Amino acid sequence: LQTTVVFTDLHGSTAVFEALGNALATQTVTQITTWVGQQCVLAGGRLVKTLGDGVLVMFADSQDAVNAVVEIQRAHSARVMRSPPNLRMPMRIGVASGEVEMVAGDCYGDAVNVAARLCDLCGPSQIWANAAAVNTVHEGPGLTLRVLGPITIRGRAEPCTVYQIEWHE
C-alpha cells in the first residue's frame, strides 16, 4: 500500500507530568493527541493509533497530509505560546511517503520507520518530511519547503533527503 505516514510527538511532556502530576498531565496529553487524530481524520487521514504523547496517521494523498500537519502545527503552536512556560509541549512532526503493510489495523514498513525517525530528529514546532512526501506538494503562502539535505537515519543504509516544511504565515 502506497501511503503517506504522519508521526507526531509532544516535546517536553515528561516535564509536564512532573509539574502537573499523572492524572492532570495524562488528561492534558490525551486531549491534545485526540485533537490531532480528529484533525487528521477531518483532513482525510486514517488514525492508526496513539502512543502515549504520539499519534500515527496514514494519508492516501501527501498534499492532504502536509496541509493537515501545517494547520495542526499552526493551531498547536498558538496554544503553546499561551501556556505557562513550564507546561509548554511543542509538537514535532515527521512525514514520510512509501510502501506500508497493514496487519490487524496497524501499519508497518519503511515509511513508518522514516516518519518516526524524522519526528525524533526534528526540533520543537518543526515538520520534517522525506522527498517522496513532498515531491508533489504545492508550495504557497504559509507553506514552503526547505531542503535540509541528505540525513543519515538510524537503521537505514542510504541517507535520506529531508525537507523542512516551513509553516509560519
Where are the language model's segments positioned?
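Catalytic beta-strand-to-alpha-helix segment of the class III nucleotidyl cyclase homology domain
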Residues: 58-169
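Catalytic NTP-binding/metal-coordinating core of nucleotidyl cyclase/transferase enzymes
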Residues: 1-68, 75
